[in-house]
A protein has these predicted regions:
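Short, polar/charged loop or turn motifs at beta-strand boundaries
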Residues: 34-51, 76-81, 157
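Outer-membrane beta-barrel translocator/receptor signature
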Residues: 100, 113-116, 127-179
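Short beta-strands and strand-coil junctions in structured, solvent-facing domains, enriched
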Residues: 27-28, 64, 85, 95-97, ...
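Extracytoplasmic
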Residues: 16-18, 29-34, 58, 73, ...
Length: 179
């Protein structure tokens, strides 16, 4: 039987050009104090912590946690400035609430396992980071996706019976296309 032709009102497929996601990062020539956390540093230090607790590994960053275990209820300060004066981005997209300019870290409980690198800029920083970057900026980029099939599983256990289970599976390229 011959394949039926879809109706005129059915979904149409359009091929688009490649989209590249970029993020603004400070370099050695940029007149701003900054620190970078590589993927290896993040992987080595992220067990049992949320992102704000990991950020406390950088100079001038302080994290306080209401729960006492480093997960949830964590707030940050950079050079004494509260989090509402820090611009936080993932792949260049702001995570700050447009109303209060806070970042609700509760909404991203496992983002840390997808982060490839982090740059913390101390001070006003690069002006492209928006008006909220008065105190500084936290720029995160996600880890690159591989072209081959891959998988990863991890289990973590910590104080006060805290635990984390994570599974990541990547199809890679299928038929020379991303799925």
């Amino acid at each position: 039987a011959a394949a039926e032709r879809p109706d005129d009102d059915s979904l149409r497929i359009y091929r688009m050009q490649e989209i590249e996601v970029t993020a603004t990062r400070a370099t050695e020539k940029t007149p701003v104090a900054f620190s970078n956390l590589s993927h290896d540093e993040i992987a080595r230090n992220s067990y049992g912590f949320d992102i704000p607790s990991l950020l406390a590994l950088t100079p001038s960053m302080i994290a306080t946690n209401e729960t006492g275990i480093g997960i949830g209820g964590t707030s940050i300060r950079l050079r004494g400035t509260d989090a509402t004066r820090l611009n936080v981005t993932v792949n260049g997209v702001s995570m700050n609430n447009p109303d209060s300019h806070s970042v609700y870290w509760y909404d991203t409980p496992d983002l840390i396992s997808s982060v490839g690198s982090v740059q913390v800029q101390r001070g006003a920083g690069i002006s492209t980071n928006g008006t909220g970057a008065f105190g500084g900026a936290v720029n995160m980029t996600t880890a690159p996706i591989g072209t081959d099939f891959s998988g990863e599983a991890s289990l973590s256990y910590g104080s006060y019976n805290t635990n984390k289970q994570a599974v990541r599976i990547s199809s890679g390229l299928l038929g020379d296309h991303w799925v």
